């Protein structure tokens, strides 16, 4: 019984080693594949950025002046020296 367990374990280990050896990729080939994938991604990214630059409206690139303060105007009656109703702006 003990001999059969050892034999079975040896067969399983040998099978795993053979399978891993067959599916293994040499290090040089793996590095070349990674370089090829990186260069393809770089080319795709360059193509996308060029397309984005062409589609960008030039007016969007100009900075616009934002209001430096909030407008505090409101419609009210008998306020801000108004005898009647009107807009009152406080700065």
Swiss-Prot record:
Leader peptide range in chain numbering: 1-24
Single GO biological process annotation from the record: cellular response to steroid hormone stimulus
Entry GO MF terms: hormone activity; lipopolysaccharide binding; lipoteichoic acid binding; peptidoglycan binding
Intrachain S-S bonds: 73-89, 76-79, 77-85, 80-88
InterPro entries per the UniProt record, alphabetical: Hepcidin
Gene Ontology CC annotations of this record: extracellular region
One Pfam family, short name: Hepcidin
Key words, A-Z: Antibiotic, Antimicrobial, Cleavage on pair of basic residues, Disulfide bond, Hormone, Secreted, Signal
Primary localization class, coarse: secreted
Propeptide: 25-64
The keyword Secreted belongs to this UniProt entry's keyword annotation: yes
Domain of life: Eukaryota
Subcellular location per the Swiss-Prot or TrEMBL entry: Secreted
Disulfide bond found in the keyword field: yes
PANTHER family named among the record's database cross-references: HEPCIDIN
Similarity-based family: Belongs to the hepcidin family.
Purpose: Seems to act as a signaling molecule involved in the maintenance of iron homeostasis. Seems to be required in conjunction with HFE to regulate both intestinal iron absorption and iron storage in macrophages. May also have antimicrobial activity.
Full protein name: Hepcidin-1
Taxonomic source organism: Danio rerio
Protein encoded by which gene: hamp1
């Amino acid at each position: 019984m003990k001999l059969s367990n050892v034999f079975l374990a040896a067969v399983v280990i040998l099978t795993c080693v053979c399978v891993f050896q067959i599916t293994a990729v040499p290090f040089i080939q793996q590095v070349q594949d990674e370089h090829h994938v990186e260069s393809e991604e770089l080319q795709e990214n360059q193509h996308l950025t060029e397309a984005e630059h062409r589609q960008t409206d030039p007016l969007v690139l100009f900075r616009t002046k934002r209001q430096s303060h909030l407008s505090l105007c409101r419609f009210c009656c008998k306020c801000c020296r108004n005898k009647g109703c009107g807009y009152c702006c406080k700065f």
